[in-house]
Curated annotation (Swiss-Prot):
The keyword Acetylation is assigned to this record: yes
Gene Ontology terms: cellular component: cytoplasm; nucleus; sarcomere
Subcellular location as annotated: Nucleus; Cytoplasm; Cytoplasm, Myofibril, Sarcomere
Gene name per UniProt: Pyroxd1
Cofactor names: FAD
Record's cofactor remark: Binds 1 FAD per subunit.
Keyword Transmembrane helix annotated: no
The protein, known as: Pyridine nucleotide-disulfide oxidoreductase domain-containing protein 1
Broad class of where this protein is predominantly found: nucleus
Keywords (A to Z) from UniProt: Acetylation, Cytoplasm, FAD, Flavoprotein, NADP, Nucleus, Oxidoreductase
Length: 498
């Protein structure tokens, strides 16, 4: 083991959006200090083309780059390409997988999260979390005639829409798609797009750019079986050709209110003498037995069994805390993340955390909630760096304004989607009202009202209402007198509140 190095004041663990943003902000604050960024991957996630759309809403590209590009931009950032083997918080040092020891004065853990796999060690079950796993999925898909997607989050939603020339069985535990993001009305609006023929003229993807081939050590990622990649950014599928082998274009069947009960390999399935279902054609309810043989069979809790070439597990993530727990008495949140206070501090001195690995445990704004999304990873990483800087210099710091209002802009099924505040009436109980406006195939607008005040909104399509609604939620103005006119398409609501 090498002798401990005087490794500088700041060490950041994790090459995802939170870690890289944190390191960049520290490098700006302390240009004379070496900032160490420890990451198991040869590529890092960089935020580019950042645009502050409104007070809280932001848009940016996520670009995968070789770590050398980060070092070129910030000469005082030193990237250590190795996983963390152990953290000794009492000694203020970390040990990396390559046998080195690094001492820190302040440490920020941004190691992200790992996918919850339905079944560990099954070659026919793929989890999609990072670019490596997304590319493995693309490779498998080129040989596939039918796949099953299990899960109802953002990645599952995108896969269901983007996968072409292949039958897709989509199993969700909820009544409707996209339960994390949408109510039944928005789900119905999107489902009609999903089940209709897709337009050939798809809008150009504009956010994620993959430059994995530029990384000189790309192959080295394959040897690190335990490496947990950072989350995929927005439009992660933009550079991937998600096509299977069948002739037809887009064929999908949704199984609702069910989960995976058991997975059988082909030989096991033959011995069991069970019957699997054929792919339901034209959305008819008639059930026929599948005569084809498949490499893997999936039995659902509703009794249905389908054969497929492989199964995609997209059932969410768990914070990647395991490498840091041994010998360290961290307080953990209910979801398993490292608890952090309003200055992103964990329960251990001089250790901060940001992004998917942490659980926000400060009293939140009434219209903010933590969700493990790339926007919050960027905000938390940036704010954690500012908190570390303030503590180092002995300055007070106010909570960042981005935590005043939950705001997220993304794209689902080629629609622009904006989520604001308590967009699904989270935590409001029954004492709230919903206002809706929907033009099929064009836009879906939902506003959540509580005691005459706007608490949240879902905007699907090009509505141009996000800035106005953001202001109304932040201002908490009494809107009772406006009634239904808030969503009247014949009234320019922006003129009311300029």
């Amino acid at each position: 083991m090498e002798a401990a190095r005087p490794a500088g004041t700041f060490v950041v663990v994790g090459g995802g959006i939170a870690g890289v943003t944190c390191a960049e902000q520290l490098a700006i604050n302390f240009p004379a200090e070496d900032i160490l960024l420890v990451t198991a991957s040869p590529v890092i996630k960089a935020v580019t083309n950042f645009k502050q759309v409104s007070k809280v809403l932001e848009e940016f590209d996520v670009e995968e780059q070789p770590s050398t590009m980060l070092e070129n931009r910030f000469p005082n950032i030193k990237v250590i390409e190795s996983g963390v083997k152990q953290l000794k918080s009492d000694k203020h040092c970390i040990f990396t997988e390559d046998g080195r020891e690094y001492v820190y004065k302040k440490l920020c853990l941004c190691a992200g999260a790992k996918p919850k796999l339905i079944c560990e060690g099954n070659p026919y079950v793929l989890g999609i979390r990072d670019t490596d796993s997304a590319q493995e999925f693309q490779k498998q898909l080129t040989k596939a005639r039918r796949i099953m997607i299990v899960g109802n989050g953002g990645i599952a939603l995108e896969l269901a829409y983007e996968v072409e020339v292949c039958e897709v069985i989509w199993a969700i535990k909820d009544k409707a798609i996209g339960n994390t993001f949408f109510d039944a009305g928005a789900a119905e609006f999107l489902t009609s797009r999903l089940l209709s023929e897709k337009s050939e003229a798809k809008l150009a993807h504009k956010r994620t750019i993959y430059t994995v081939e530029e990384a000189k050590k790309e192959t080295s990622t394959k040897s690190k079986a335990d490496y947990v990649g950072s989350a995929l950014g927005p439009d992660w599928h933009g550079g991937l050709a998600l096509k299977g082998t069948e002739e037809f274009s887009h064929s999908i069947h949704i199984e609702t209110k069910c989960e995976v009960k058991k997975i059988y390999l082909q030989e096991e399935f033959k011995i069991m003498k069970k019957k699997s279902l054929a792919f339901p054609k034209d959305h008819h309810k008639s059930v026929t037995v599948d005569k084809e043989m498949w490499p893997v069979y999936v039995e659902l809790t509703n009794g249905s069994i389908y054969g497929c070439d492989f199964l995609v597990s997209a059932t969410g993530v768990t914070p990647n805390v395991q490498p840091f727990l041994h010998g360290n008495d961290f307080d953990l949140g209910e979801d398993g993340g490292l608890r952090v206070d309003e200055q992103m501090r964990t329960s251990l001195p001089d250790i901060y955390a940001a992004g998917d690995i942490c659980t926000a445990c400060w009293p939140p704004s009434p219209v903010w909630q933590q969700m493990r999304l790339w926007t919050q990873a960027r905000q938390m990483g940036c704010y954690a760096a500012k908190c570390m800087a303030a503590a180092t210099m002995g300055h007070p710091i106010d909570m960042d304004f981005s935590f005043e209002l939950f705001a997220h802009v993304t794209k689902f099924f080629n629609y622009k989607v904006v989520l604001l505040g308590k967009y699904n009436a989270q935590g409001l109980g029954v004492d709230h009202e919903l206002m809706l406006r929907c033009t099929r195939g064009q836009e879906y607008i939902k506003v959540v009202m509580h005691n005459g005040r706007m608490m949240g909104a879902v905007l699907i399509g090009e509505t141009d209402l996000e800035e106005t609604f953001e202001n109304l939620i932040l201002n908490q103005m009494d809107l009772s007198s406006y009634g239904e006119d808030l969503l009247n398409p014949d009234i320019d609501i922006e003129d009311y509140f300029d």
